[in-house]
Amino acid sequence: MPRRGLVAGPDLEYFQRRYFTPAEVAQHNRPEDLWVSYLGRVYDLTSLAQEYKGNLLLKPIVEVAGQDISHWFDPKTRDIRKHIDPLTGCLRYCTPRGRFVHVPPQLPCSDWANDFGKPWWQGSYYEVGRLSAKTRSIRIINTLTSQEHTLEVGVLESIWEILHRYLPYNSHAASYTWKYEGKNLNMDFTLEENGIRDEEEEFDYLSMDGTLHTPAILLYFNDDLTEL
């Protein structure tokens, strides 16, 4: 395990989170910053959008920037859904929004360049992580400064990943001991694995507002010799 000062853990400069929430994906909703999600994965199509900038075939993709487009795909084949084309009677990709990048034309066409290799939706070239199927809120309280922040996190994220989310609020967050109800958290475990239960279903069953009770993680500063 690498070390920073006296604190063991991953190098956060190169740390890659595994999960992204739908709200995070929704923030990337412009041609110059274009993400989509489908079939449980998140994809950064910004470079594709730049490559085909000004091309009408990009329009259907730009229209769904920041959204989940799982309904475009057959979950069994992970390919674009297909249908019998009423004009040709052939099996074609189903594109209700109109044909988009890398989808072949309806009829044979001599000016269609098909030398792009794999279509953008096949393979993992554009993949940046997984989509959090379920999220929850967690409060993080810095006991040194009494500052409190509430984060939306994926239920399968480790504490390290939650720490990475928290860095914009406290760039020295890895120099703190993270505790819940007086016990040190295992940074490699999820909230649930650390005993921080998700009680949303219980609140729903009781017809109570779950936002009135959000668990809190307390941060205690360590003098770990890392740069302030």
UniProtKB/Swiss-Prot annotation:
Residues 17-83 form the Cytochrome b5 heme-binding domain. Coiled coil: none annotated. Heme binds at Y52, H83. Its main location: cytoplasm. GO terms for cellular component: cell projection; cytoplasm; cytoskeleton. GO terms for biological process: cilium movement; regulation of cilium beat frequency. It is found in: Cytoplasm, Cytoskeleton, Cilium axoneme. SUPFAM superfamilies: Cytochrome b5-like heme/steroid binding domain. One of its GO terms (molecular function) is metal ion binding. Keywords: Cell projection, Cytoplasm, Cytoskeleton, Heme, Iron, Metal-binding. The keyword DNA damage does not apply. It holds the Pfam family Cyt-b5. Belongs to the cytochrome b5 family. PANTHER family: CYTOCHROME B5 DOMAIN-CONTAINING PROTEIN 1. Radial spoke stalk protein that binds heme under oxidizing conditions. Required for the coordinated beating of multiple cilia maybe by functioning in a redox signaling pathway. This is Cytochrome b5 domain-containing protein 1. It comes from Homo sapiens (Human).
